[in-house]
Regions:
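Short hydrophobic targeting helices and cationic amphipathic motifs
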Residues: 3-6
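Terminal targeting signals and extreme-terminal segments of soluble enzymes
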Residues: 11-95, 101-156
């Protein structure tokens, strides 16, 4: 019985180290403060929700922003795009689907889908540069290959 447990445990460890991470879904509830006078979620909140989903994605992919920053690197936002399809309202439960869709040694691109009960509300993208804390571009693949591999394993 314990031998079987060890076999399964070892199999799960091997499997988890080889299985590609495929995105993450975060849930947010539209708060009253996030709505306008008409009760519709204000457009500026989507950027915040994208960040929530992106940081949840990074944690779920077992990438540590803290470790990346300890190495002296940061990933500032360089562009943000959002296409609104339908309105979101106060108390809506929104699912933010985040995935890493592009990776280069100096840049990351995340894509987002915002849904409510499976209905598409918005789509978006954010692009992030890879720079030192002094804001100098860095080739992470060359200078920190272990960090690059973590992002590569999370690539959709």
């Amino acid at each position: 019985e314990s031998l079987h447990y060890l076999d399964v445990s070892m199999f799960n460890h091997i499997l988890s180290s080889r299985v590609k991470f495929m995105g993450h879904i975060s849930t947010v509830e539209v708060r009253y403060a996030e709505t306008d006078q008409m009760g519709i979620a204000h457009h500026s909140n989507y950027a915040v929700w994208f960040e929530v989903a992106r940081t949840d994605f990074i944690k779920a992919a077992r990438i540590s922003y803290t470790d990346v920053e300890k190495e002296g690197n940061i990933t500032p936002l360089t562009s943000l795009e959002c296409k609104y399809k339908k309105a979101a309202f106060y108390e809506d439960q929104l699912q933010i689907h985040a995935s890493l869709t592009k990776l280069s040694p100096v840049r990351l691109e995340f894509s987002y889908k915002v849904t409510r009960d499976g209905d598409l509300i918005a789509t978006g993208k954010t692009t992030h540069g890879m720079v030192t804390k002094d804001l100098k571009p860095i080739n992470v693949k060359k200078e920190h290959p272990e960090i690059y591999r973590m992002f590569e394993n999370a690539l959709d």
